[in-house]
A protein has these predicted regions:
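Cytochrome P450
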Residues: 1-214
Length: 214
């Protein structure tokens, strides 16, 4: 962050480092907390989405075949996986004024729960919403990271990590098969896959190279 103050760039860290409050640059403890928040926000969703995508690849083998045949689908596949997995289950908000949304009246100070997973499978937005479709033309319209001013700070990091991870994984292990064993941590906020048992197959497609937990 100190470097971004001396050598500003066109990125988020520079924006934070150069921000001012009451005419003064933000204190160091705020800067440290900000970049740590970005890293953790991007890492947690990435881990759960990575495991969830591997599970989807086993459940929808025809989609896995499409990606293996055309790796350029990986970025859109990552968006579609985020839609299907919805790593953050919900978020709570407080209405700051009386409002009406789609016919539903919302009073000032009323608490609301936003169910991202439900929105991401809205059939009016995503036809055949329960299908994992790596070619879906509006996959990026998902709300896995929220929306507007409260959109997750780690969204870009998470997307970059997913894309790079699957480029490497599919290059080394073209066939990854979920064994059906998994451990879901009890968590009301995030879709926490703490363990996913898989078989990794090398390019020869003969036998599992190793059994791993993702």
């Amino acid at each position: 962050m100190a470097d971004r103050r001396l050598n500003p760039r066109a990125d988020l860290l520079t924006t934070i480092a150069q921000s001012k409050l009451n005419g003064e640059l933000l204190p160091q403890e705020f800067l440290d907390g900000s970049w740590l928040l970005i890293i953790f926000a991007g890492n947690d969703t990435s881990r759960n989405s990575l495991s969830g995508t591997i599970r989807l690849m086993t459940q929808f083998p025809e989609q896995r075949a499409l990606v293996l045949e055309d790796p350029s689908l990986i970025p859109n596949m990552s968006e579609e996986a985020l839609r299907m997995v919805s790593p953050v289950i919900h978020m709570r908000r407080t209405a700051i004024q009386d409002s009406e949304l789609n016919g539903q009246r919302i009073a000032e100070d009323e608490k609301l729960v936003l169910w991202y997973g439900a929105a991401n499978r809205d059939p009016e937005v995503f036809p055949n919403p329960d299908k994992f479709d790596v070619s879906r033309d509006n996959a990026e319209k998902h709300l896995a990271f929220g929306h507007g001013v409260h959109k997750c700070l780690g969204s870009r990091i998470a997307k970059m990590q997913l894309r790079m991870a699957f480029e490497r994984i599919f290059d080394r292990f073209p066939q990854i098969v979920w064994t059906g064993k998994q451990t879901i941590s009890p968590n009301a906020l995030v879709h926490a896959i703490s363990s996913l048992r898989v078989n990794l197959y090398g390019p020869n497609k003969k036998r599992p190279v190793i059994v791993q937990n993702l």
